[in-house]
Structures are given as structure tokens and as C-alpha cells.
């Protein structure tokens, strides 16, 4: 019983530590400057950073990543560390989704796939990150951007990733973030930000 309580205290302490780290990372960026950035390069870098981070912790993790980058995109003024954090959060969630689905699918073939598309859309840039994981239920959709809401097991998620991502895109970059999902089929996040 003492050992069980110690484990619970340790898990709770680790989660609190992770939450505080997330808040500190987010609050640091108040006076960040907007820099003309190659979003193709930045996005690609953080897509693969996420993949390798997940792979380092789970040697059995494997996924096909299909990338489409519009190399004619002009440089776009963004806060690079914030935009990259948004990409990282969405990619981490996509990796988690396909990995958790692959662990639950034993008998029929499942090929974990994440699609990343970055393109010019009139006077905006559109970034789409789509996975073929378990999808998101209607109940979860309603709470998706709520701070501290997570569907991950204790110790694996803080519930800050999507709320921070929404804030980065909408408040700091005058953009939009939308999510479409079909249970057991796909989840697709679409970010648009103005080209300026």
C-alpha cells in the first residue's frame, strides 16, 4: 500500500512538473519577434524531430510519413519557436494516435500513416497534418482545446498541447485551426495563417 501511494505521488509530481514546464515554455514567448521564415524547412524539421523523439522512446514505433511541401511558398513572418511548437504538438499527437492504434490491431494489416501538406492558399498558408489513427469521438471533440484535458494515460500527457497550439495559431499568428475526424479512420488538423 505504501509502495502504491509512492508511485501515485511520483506520477502526480511528474505530471505537475510537465504542466509547469509547458506553462513556462508558453509564457516565455510574449515579446517574441516575427521573422520571415521558410515554413517548408521549419515544418519538415519539426515533423522529423517528433518522429525521432517518439522512436527513441518506442523502438517498435514505425510510421509512413507522406510529405508535400510547396517550395514556391514565400518566406512567411512567424514567431519561429511558437510555430514550430504548434507543428511539434500536432505531430506528437499524430504519432501517438497511430502508435496506439497499431498496438491494438493484431490480426488485420494496419499501416500507420501520417500525411503532412504545406501549401499556399490564396493569401494564406495552409498546413494539414492527418493521421490514420483511431480518430476522435464527438465527446472528445467538444473538449479538444480545453486546457489540461487529455485522453492519454496519467503521466503521458499534460492536456496543454492543443490549447497552446490553438493560442499560438489564433492569437499570435491571426490564423485558424480546424479539426476533422472520423472514428477508426482519420484525424486531420488544418492550420491556416496569413502570408505577411
State the predicted function of each range.
Residues 1-196:
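Core catalytic ATP-binding domain of two-component histidine kinases
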